[in-house]
């Protein structure tokens, strides 16, 4: 029953959005430059917000109207429009953000609408953008995973209710994707996927931004660090199995897990069952993540899927070597033998061996760490990406 409901909801939503786009594209085109962008999305933490919204605001294009659940950080030229609780209760959070985004078209007409993740934010951006004669941008937050099989494998309550791939929803998702004036992907894997499925409009690879000018600790006293949500999506259970394997070779090995989530209690139990209480520390949510990253020798992710992890980029900027799953676009930055390692997600022994070898070879680790930082500084520095966004937005509007 859940699969049927999800299929109906997604199919009707995508079909309606495509119809609106086809009927209004070009017909309601605005010729007046308004110097304003409307962004719709959900931002789970300040790091994600600054990685993606701050470069938009700093691009110099103009005012940014952010329709989201709650204010996160104050920035010049950033205006929050957050639906009140009564609207969330009546329409749902996604529905309320749709109506608030629509209302902005009258209150603050914009040149460009941007949505993160195809459902529901990018759908909202497409419908509202087309109705008000604006350009529309789709940011593939989770890469091709949010399109493959209709997005059944992503962290989204409606899409995950599909429970298995849906050819119908996937076909509609691909057709919907082709309606956007610009698609933003995080790396080469997602770019190739979008091109294979006949996207012919503007396409850009833009990662999240990181602050590369923060102080870096001289003391690397954390052997391994994980930063992320403690949920099945990130597979921290797999990470703990790896930690147990490393601890058999390096008795005083220390792993630090930063973040919280629904799986924390189960993970703490797993630590006890594996007998690695002395090797693992759960820190929960922290405000000093950059400081912790700067103290880490290795940054490890055993996720079953990622786009490009912001935490990984931040760790690389702090001269921490990434050892991550070879999923999504992580390998664009974790380049084997040059800046880190991308390992098959199921290869537990590969993770264990690589981590043990890196912790035992300081010279090799230093070489990788220096290269990792250089790559991130060149491609992901916040100032550089602000300029990149300025060029992209102006080209799109012109």
Roles of regions detected by a PLM:
Residues 350, 357, 364-379, 385-391:
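A short, well-ordered alpha-helix in the C-terminal region of glycosyltransferases
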Residues 321-324, 334:
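Short hydrophobic beta-strand element within catalytic cores of glycosyltransferases
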Residues 225-228, 236-282, 360-364, 398:
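A conserved nucleotide-sugar
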Residues 131, 162-182:
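Membrane-proximal helix-turn-helix segments that form the acceptor-binding/catalytic region
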Residues 115-121, 140:
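Short His-centered aromatic/hydrophobic patch
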Residues 37-39, 210, 216-234, 239-243:
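Conserved donor-binding/catalytic core segment of Leloir-type glycosyltransferases
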Residues 336-337, 341-348, 357-362:
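Conserved acidic donor-binding segment of nucleotide-sugar-dependent glycosyltransferases
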Residues 285, 304:
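Aromatic "clamp/platform" in nucleotide-sugar-dependent glycosyltransferases that forms part
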């Amino acid at each position: 029953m859940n699969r049927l409901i999800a299929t109906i909801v997604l199919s009707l939503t995508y079909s309606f959005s495509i119809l609106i786009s086809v009927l209004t594209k070009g017909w309601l085109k605005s010729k007046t430059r308004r110097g304003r962008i409307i962004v719709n999305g959900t931002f789970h933490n300040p790091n994600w917000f600054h990685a993606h919204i701050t470069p938009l605001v700093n691009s110099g294009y103009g005012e940014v109207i952010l329709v989201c659940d709650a204010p996160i950080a104050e920035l010049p030229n950033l205006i929050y429009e957050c639906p009140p609780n009564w609207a969330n209760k009546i329409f749902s959070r996604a529905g309320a953000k749709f109506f608030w985004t629509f209302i902005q078209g009258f209150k603050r007409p914009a040149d460009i609408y941007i949505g993160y993740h195809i459902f529901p934010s990018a759908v909202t951006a497409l419908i509202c953008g087309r109705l008000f004669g604006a350009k529309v941008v789709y940011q593939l937050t989770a890469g091709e995973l949010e399109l493959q099989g209709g997005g059944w494998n992503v962290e989204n309550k409606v899409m995950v209710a599909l429970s298995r791939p849906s050819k119908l929803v996937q076909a509609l998702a691909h057709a919907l994707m082709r309606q956007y004036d610009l698609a933003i992907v995080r790396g080469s894997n997602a770019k190739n996927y979008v091109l294979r499925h006949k996207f012919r409009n503007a396409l850009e690879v833009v990662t999240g931004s990181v602050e590369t000018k923060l102080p870096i600790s001289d003391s690397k006293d954390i052997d391994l660090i994980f930063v992320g949500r403690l949920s099945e999506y990130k597979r921290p259970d797999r990470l703990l199995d790896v930690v147990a394997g490393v601890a058999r070779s390096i008795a005083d090995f220390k792993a630090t897990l930063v973040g919280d989530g629904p799986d924390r209690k189960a993970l703490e139990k797993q630590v006890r069952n594996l007998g690695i209480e002395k090797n693992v520390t759960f820190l929960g949510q922290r405000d000093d993540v950059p400081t912790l990253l700067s103290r880490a020798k290795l940054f490890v992710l055993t996720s079953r899927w990622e786009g490009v992890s912001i935490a990984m980029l931040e760790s690389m900027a702090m001269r921490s070597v990434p050892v991550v799953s070879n999923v999504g676009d992580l390998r664009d930055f974790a380049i084997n033998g040059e800046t880190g390692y991308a390992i098959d997600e199921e290869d537990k022994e590969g993770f264990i061996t690589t981590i043990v070898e890196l912790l035992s070879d300081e010279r090799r680790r230093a070489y990788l760490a220096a290269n990792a930082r250089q790559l991130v500084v060149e491609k992901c520095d916040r100032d550089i990406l602000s300029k990149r966004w300025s060029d992209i937005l102006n080209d799109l509007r012109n």
